Amino acid sequence: MNDTGRRILLNCDMGESFGAWRMGDDVHSMPLVDQANLACGFHAGDPLTMRRAVELAVRHGVSIGAHPAYPDLSGFGRRSLACSAEEVHAMVLYQIGALDAFCRSLGTQVAYVKPHGALYNDLVGDDELLRAVLDACAAYRKGLPLMVLALADNGRELELADEADVPLLFEAFADRAYLPDGRLAPRRLGGAVHHDPQRIIEQALAIARGEAFPDYDGNPLRLTADSLCVHGDNPQSLAVLRRLRAALDSL
């Protein structure tokens, strides 16, 4: 349980294969999560991959999130691009609609939006970009939630979301190191991504219980989150997901 008394959810980025290139183990990971963030074609995912990922989520009763990104297939969406707010609004709306077409064809719908990679990180501290993404969510469907990074202080995000009339979901990461303000440690830093399964489990359980855990510098950090993410592109992702699912279910 998080400090609101609600059960914390478990999410994973999926549907990230592209053509002959394979990423992650969606078939075995999907039954272990509550929410699946599905790539929409800009950083990964092609139409067939998207359809299959939606089918898999529907089969296992998993909530589907659109995972829009900058148009950056070669960089897997992890490079910031010099896009205007108008461009970001359009590309996010485009990607939500693409994934939702597959959802609707299978009797479901996109339940939330979680930006990917560099776009996700760029929203932190950039009000113009955050407004563009919030407005895209609001334009697509009233009440469509946006998943954002849980920070030590999310006051600004809450203020802008309230102006746009968009619900927020706050996300924390089990397998990433954090800076003191709650931002993710950049991947270029050594130790920014946790690979030790025990450390991942310990950090996840601390967040789920509303307890402090060590930030990148070893100082205590406390975050309030609705959902925990484990990345599907780590070598030990499936084994960690299984252990984490069991640990969260025991709380």
Curated annotation (Swiss-Prot):
Biological processes per GO annotation: carbohydrate metabolic process
Swiss-Prot/TrEMBL keywords: ATP-binding, Hydrolase, Nucleotide-binding
Catalyzed reaction equations: 5-oxo-L-proline + ATP + 2 H2O = L-glutamate + ADP + phosphate + H(+)
GO MF assignments: 5-oxoprolinase (ATP-hydrolyzing) activity; ATP binding
EC number(s) given by UniProt: 3.5.2.9
Record keyword Hydrolase present: yes
Name of the protein in question: 5-oxoprolinase subunit A 3
Source species: Pseudomonas aeruginosa (strain ATCC 15692 / DSM 22644 / CIP 104116 / JCM 14847 / LMG 12228 / 1C / PRS 101 / PAO1)
